[in-house]
Curated annotation (Swiss-Prot):
Catalytic activity: heme b(in) + ATP + H2O = heme b(out) + ADP + phosphate + H(+)
UniProt GO molecular function: ABC-type heme transporter activity; ATP binding; ATP hydrolysis activity
Primary role: Part of the ABC transporter complex CcmAB involved in the biogenesis of c-type cytochromes; once thought to export heme, this seems not to be the case, but its exact role is uncertain. Responsible for energy coupling to the transport system.
Domain ABC transporter: 4-207
Protein name (record): Cytochrome c biogenesis ATP-binding export protein CcmA
Quaternary context: The complex is composed of two ATP-binding proteins (CcmA) and two transmembrane proteins (CcmB).
Family listed: Belongs to the ABC transporter superfamily. CcmA exporter (TC 3.A.1.107) family.
Organism of origin: Escherichia coli O6:H1 (strain CFT073 / ATCC 700928 / UPEC)
Compartments it resides in: Cell inner membrane
């Protein structure tokens, strides 16, 4: 039994089947990239895995239990960052981290922002930051979270090369410590092929 399992997932949109019979099992320490063409259902699959949407058939299980039976404990173990940064634009970068991690002290939040490349921008309202900087505010949570499972939809959008490298290193560290990372990205990952497992939505049912 793996930590996260997709079992015979079916997803249909507008009378079109995005994927069917999709099954896979993820274990501690895995780093997974969901691949497929535009419109293949990559974001849809991520939302199914987070529990934000329900499949038309099939099940998602966490530690052997369907998500709807373990929703609270699952979400305590999950960090989800979607296409939108999901941050409070009227708050500063530092205030945003305090909002999402109320048990984190200021020093930890400042360190997370520095790791994300936002040193010097901590006290600026988010609505005055660039798109890339706003994305970094959301991604700074990667240095604070205690969640085991990270699900990230295009995390490198609007991030420069140095930022991508830093984020990639953080993901590698997380998986080396037994965490799981699932992501979509159009950018090449600067890591050894042996470290990345790819699940293709162009070959559904055989992932």
């Amino acid at each position: 039994m793996g930590m996260l399992e997709a079992r015979e997932l079916l997803c249909e949109r507008d009378e079109r089947t995005l994927f069917s019979g999709l099954s896979f099992t993820l274990n501690a320490g895995e780093w997974v990239q969901i691949t497929g063409s535009n419109g293949a259902g990559k974001t849809t699959l991520l939302r199914l895995l987070t529990g934000l949407s329900r499949p038309d058939a099939g099940d998602v299980l966490w530690q052997g239990q369907p998500l709807h039976q373990v929703r609270d404990s699952y979400h305590q173990n999950l960090l989800w960052i979607g296409h939108q940064p999901g941050i409070k634009t009227r708050l500063t970068a530092l205030e945003n981290l305090h909002f999402y991690h109320r048990d984190g002290d200021t020093a930890q939040c400042l360190e997370a922002l520095a790791q994300a490349g936002l040193a010097g921008f901590e006290d600026i309202p988010v609505n005055q930051l660039s798109a890339g900087q706003q994305r970094r505010v959301a991604l700074a949570r990667l240095w604070l979270t205690r969640a085991t499972l990270w699900i990230l939809d295009e995390p490198f959008t609007a991030i420069d090369v140095n930022g991508v490298d830093r984020l990639t290193q953080r993901m590698a560290q997380h998986t080396e410590q037994g965490g799981i990372v699932i992501l979509t990205t159009h950018q090449p990952l600067n890591v050894a092929e042996s470290k990345i497992r790819r699940i293709s939505l162009t070959q559904t049912g055989a992932a």
